Amino acid sequence: MVKVLVLYYSAYGHMEKMAKAAAEGAREGGAEVTIKRVPELVPPDVAKASHYKIDQDAPIATPAELADYDAIIIGTATRYGMMAAQMKNFLDQTGGLWAKGALINKVGSVMVSTATQHGGAELALISTQWQMQHQGMIIVPLSYAYQGQMGNDVVRGGAPYGMTTTADGDGSRQPSEQELDGARFQGKRVAEITAKLNS
C-alpha cells in the first residue's frame, strides 16, 4: 500500500476542506493517507484578529518527514499568484532532502485556493510544481481527465495542472461540491498512479 501525505496551508479553512477531500480520494484509491499542515508564521494575536481558522485538527509537519511518503499532495492558499509564504517557508527548508535526493521519483501534486477567479491560481500551481521538479519528483496533475472542471455556467474550480477553489476576498465562498469532488478525483488519481509506479 502506497503512503500519501496531504500537506496543506489554510488560513481560513478553504484548503483544509480541499485537503480532507483529496485525502478521501487517495484512500478510495487504495493509499494509506496522512494529512498534515505547515506551521503558521503569522503571530497568534494577528491571526486571531484576522479571523484565521486556528482550530484545524491536522498536526504540524516537519520537512524531514516528507521522505517517508511515496506521494505528496500540496494544498496552499495563493498570495499574489504564488504559494503562501507559510508553504514556501516550509519547502525552503527541504534543502537537506534535495542534497540527498530523498524525494527523487516520488509523486507530487498540487491544489490551490485564491480569493478571486483570476487570482493567480494557475501560476501558483505551476510554481509549486517547479519546487517539486527541483526535487526530482514526478508530477501528477489533475488533468482534463476530470470533466467536472468543464463549463462556464457557474464558478468552477480546476485547471489541467491541479484542483482550485475560489474563496472570495472576504473568505465567504466555501469550496463547492464540484471543487471538493475535483480534489477527491485528484487524490484518487495520485494514489492510483503512485501504486502503478511502485509496483
UniProtKB/Swiss-Prot annotation:
One GO cellular-component annotation of the UniProt record comes to:
membrane
Q: What is its EC number?
A: 1.6.5.2
Q: For the region Disordered, what residue ranges are annotated?
A: 157-185
| Cofactor(s) in the UniProt record | FMN
**What InterPro entries does the database record attribute to this sequence?**
Flavodoxin/NO_synth (IPR008254), Flavoprotein-like_sf (IPR029039), Flavoprotein_WrbA-like (IPR010089), FMN_Rdtase-like_dom (IPR005025), NQO (IPR037513)
Q: Which reactions does this protein catalyse?
A: a quinone + NADH + H(+) = a quinol + NAD(+); a quinone + NADPH + H(+) = a quinol + NADP(+)
Q: Which free-text remark accompanies the cofactor?
A: Binds 1 FMN per monomer.
Q: Where is the composition biased (Polar residues)?
A: 163-177
Residue ranges annotated for the Flavodoxin-like domain, each copy included: 4-190
Q: Name one GO molecular function term.
A: FMN binding
The EC category is: oxidoreductase
Q: What's in the keyword line of the UniProt record?
A: Flavoprotein, FMN, NAD, NADP, Nucleotide-binding, Oxidoreductase
Where, by residue number, does NAD(+) bind?
Y12
> Which amino acids does the record list as binding FMN?
10-15, 78-80, 113-119, 134
One Pfam family it belongs to: FMN_red
Residues in a coiled coil are: none
- Domain of life from the UniProt record: Bacteria
The entry marks the following residues as binding substrate, namely W98
Q: Which family does it belong to?
A: Belongs to the WrbA family.
The protein's name in its UniProt record: NAD(P)H dehydrogenase (quinone)
Q: Which organism is it from?
A: Brucella anthropi (strain ATCC 49188 / DSM 6882 / CCUG 24695 / JCM 21032 / LMG 3331 / NBRC 15819 / NCTC 12168 / Alc 37) (Ochrobactrum anthropi)
